[in-house]
UniProtKB/Swiss-Prot annotation:
Record GO cellular component, one term: chloroplast
Species assigned in the record: Platanus occidentalis
A Pfam cross-reference name: RNA_pol_A_CTD
Name under which the protein is recorded: DNA-directed RNA polymerase subunit alpha
SMART domains in the cross-refs: RPOLD
Gene name of the record: rpoA
Domain of life: Eukaryota
Alpha C-terminal domain (alpha-CTD): region residues: 267-337
UniProt remark on domains: The N-terminal domain is essential for RNAP assembly and basal transcription, whereas the C-terminal domain is involved in interaction with transcriptional regulators and with upstream promoter elements.
Task of the protein: DNA-dependent RNA polymerase catalyzes the transcription of DNA into RNA using the four ribonucleoside triphosphates as substrates.
Keyword Zinc-finger: no
């Protein structure tokens, strides 16, 4: 556990982590303050941040399991202690960390007797299990336990849709939210004749993100929501001129890619973050440690610069070049001029 004495600055508006602890592999806690704020600002920020933390952050989970040997979801299999339904519920609880796009395939194939746990999941390199000890099933006899899995990165909560499971495929309720809970509270105080506030924000996560990472992600998503207003003049979006009821453009990730092709590179690249690329966790962490967070940061480096990063290999550089070529049709220069 890390604790720091709370001190209030009357000069610059600052975030500060005042408490941080890991209660378990799947429960992290962080407590943050923002100060000094004028009266009313703390509640505005607190409500927006809580909503962003609980609803706007992407997470990764298992969304489907498939095995042709299973007749229906509520059946039991000889040699397995749990019913199929219980196994699906256990798979739902598996906490994963990834930076993948969309859906990927994974699998489990193990022979009993013995316990099947999260460490037995064979997943893509861009996906890692937070807690390898999470229980899936208990094989009581020497049987083969093989199932195919679908892993997806998304946000929010998705109920499984009815499925007759003719192909042995069973959807799983998906809880993509890495933040388990978030609360905010406000402390008011007087600074001379002026009333000011301190915002306290508490965050609990499932271990796939730390509270500090969740706070960063939520802040970034809130910023993204306001980008259209910042560039409204550039796009000639004037509400008073919208006489014909023309639908205003919706700014998406693909719109940002279009901006790159329209030579508005710097603005677009600044708001596309490297965790939106399909980089393996090790490569992503190396870039992050070198303060490379966005594509703009990445394009400010040459291949030679990347090779100077600690633990970086030529294979990592080639992988980055491949992703840039695939998604953006651009290359990094070999050397800085």
């Amino acid at each position: 556990m890390v604790r720091e004495k709370v001190t209030v600055s009357t000069r610059t508006l600052q975030w500060k982590c005042v408490e941080s602890r890991a209660d378990s592999k799947r429960l992290y806690y962080g407590r943050f303050i923002l100060s000094p704020l004028i009266k009313g600002q703390a509640d505005t920020i607190g409500i927006a941040m809580r909503r962003a933390l609980l609803g706007e952050i992407e997470g990764t989970c298992i969304t489907r399991a498939k095995s042709e040997k299973i007749p229906h979801e509520y059946s039991t299999i000889v040699g397995i202690e749990e019913s199929v339904h219980e196994i699906l519920m256990n798979l739902k609880e598996i906490v994963l960390r990834s930076n993948l796009y969309g859906t990927r395939n994974a699998s489990i194939c193990i022979r009993g007797p013995g316990y099947v746990t999260a460490q037995d999941i064979i997943s893509p390199p861009s996906v890692e299990t937070v807690d390898n000890t999470q229980h899936i099933a208990n094989l009581t006899e020497p049987i083969d336990f093989c199932i195919e899995l679908e892993i997806e990165r998304n946000r929010g909560y998705r109920m499984k849709t009815p499925n007759n499971s003719q192909d042995g495929s069973y959807p799983i309720d998906a809880v993509f939210m890495p933040v388990r809970n978030a609360n905010h509270s406000i402390h008011s105080y007087a600074n001379g004749n002026e009333k000011q506030e301190i915002l306290f924000l508490e965050i609990w996560t499932n271990g796939s993100l730390t509270p500090k990472e969740a706070l960063h992600e939520a802040s970034r998503n809130l910023i993204d929501l306001f980008i259209p207003f910042l560039h409204a003049q550039e796009e000639n979006i004037l509400l008073e001129d919208n006489q014909n009821g023309v639908t205003l453009p919706f700014f998406t990730f693909h719109d940002r890619l279009a901006k790159i092709r329209k030579n508005e590179k710097e603005i677009a690249l600044k708001y596309i973050f490297i965790d939106q690329s399909e980089l393996p966790p090790r490569t992503y962490n190396c870039l992050k440690r070198s303060n490379i967070h966005t594509l703009l940061d990445l394009f400010n480096n040459s291949q030679e610069d990347l090779m100077k990063i600690e633990d970086f290999r030529i294979e990592d550089v080639k992988q980055i070049l491949g992703i840039l070529q695939k998604h953006f049709t651009v290359d990094l220069p070999k050397n800085k001029f």
